[in-house]
């Protein structure tokens, strides 16, 4: 297991109370040895005007996952902040849920890189994101 902080899924989800994460309906669903996953509904909260998943909602899911994964790689007195987010949208989603899968690309002392892939309910890749974070403290 790569994580330096040991949180349960319930504890991870509690960090979202009264935030944009909760408003978008993002829920952490899996904490594995080197992976963090979350689901987000595709509904009126996450649609763009044409009834499709908003690209910004996919980006918010990605940054949520990468930032929390980055935080779990820090020690007491440290935090992470996002420095760069790149998102490539591959296919539209109009309903159901999407699942984000976050894994590390680079884990340095001062910066981290995370890949977050967003899948639809059929397991098709909808969006590929890369998040860079800086470790502070």
Curated annotation (Swiss-Prot):
The keyword Methyltransferase does not apply. GO terms for cellular component: cytosol. It comes from the Bacteria. Its main location: cytoplasm. It is found in: Cytoplasm. It is an enzyme of class 3 (hydrolase). One of its GO terms (molecular function) is 1,4-dihydroxy-2-naphthoyl-CoA thioesterase activity. Pfam families: 4HBT (PF03061). The active site is at residue 63. Required for optimal enterobactin synthesis. Acts as a proofreading enzyme that prevents EntB misacylation by hydrolyzing the thioester bound existing between EntB and wrongly charged molecules. HAMAP family: Thioesterase_EntH (MF_00907). This is Proofreading thioesterase EntH. The gene is entH.
